[in-house]
């Protein structure tokens, strides 16, 4: 699973996901990309599931870039514990994804394979996404 090697503080506040993504909104490395259309926390497990789905379709051809990294810890209190007594333990890591952010990029495969792979990866995420190409940044909704 993806997670930071070290962090300055173990726990973070939740924060808010307002507005659109500031950076990472264009396909910079590959030919095809998967773009988020809504804000969400994407967990390390969801990123890994998407990566596996893409690699399963592409087999051993092509190259994949993961453009998001889960650097925010999220906490959870144990089941059946009363409120209070401090913040819960770190349960996992998430990446804060805002609308417009490119999540995955792929290259080295034909158009049909790229679209099929990104469609499978899109099904692993809790948000609507669209497939975009380097030339056509408008894309098609998935």
Curated annotation (Swiss-Prot):
Gene Ontology biological-process entries: translation
Family matches, as SUPFAM superfamilies: Ribosomal protein L16p/L10e
Keywords carried by this UniProt record: Ribonucleoprotein, Ribosomal protein, RNA-binding, rRNA-binding, tRNA-binding
Pfam families linked: Ribosomal_L16
Gene Ontology MF, one: rRNA binding
GO cellular component, one term: cytosolic large ribosomal subunit
InterPro entries attached to this UniProt entry: Ribosomal_uL16, Ribosomal_uL16_bact-type, Ribosomal_uL16_CS, Ribosomal_uL16_dom, Ribosomal_uL16_sf
Function: Binds 23S rRNA and is also seen to make contacts with the A and possibly P site tRNAs.
Similarity annotation: Belongs to the universal ribosomal protein uL16 family.
Complex and partners: Part of the 50S ribosomal subunit.
Protein's UniProt name: Large ribosomal subunit protein uL16
Phylogenetic placement of the source organism: Bacteria, Thermotogati, Thermotogota, Thermotogae, Thermotogales
Gene: rplP
């Amino acid at each position: 699973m993806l997670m930071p090697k070290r962090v300055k503080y173990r726990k973070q506040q939740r924060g808010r996901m307002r507005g659109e993504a500031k950076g990472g909104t264009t396909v910079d490395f590959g030919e095809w990309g998967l773009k988020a259309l809504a804000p969400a926390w994407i967990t390390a497990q969801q990123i890994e599931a998407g990566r596996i789905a893409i690699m399963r379709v592409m087999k051993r051809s092509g190259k994949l870039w993961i453009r998001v990294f889960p650097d925010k810890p999220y906490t959870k209190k144990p089941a059946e514990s009363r409120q209070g007594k401090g913040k819960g333990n770190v349960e996992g890591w998430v990446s804060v994804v805002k609308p417009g952010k490119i999540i995955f990029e792929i290259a080295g495969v034909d158009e049909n394979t790229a679209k099929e792979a990104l469609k499978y990866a899109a099904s692993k995420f809790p948000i609507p996404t669209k497939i975009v190409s380097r030339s056509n940044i408008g894309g098609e909704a998935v």
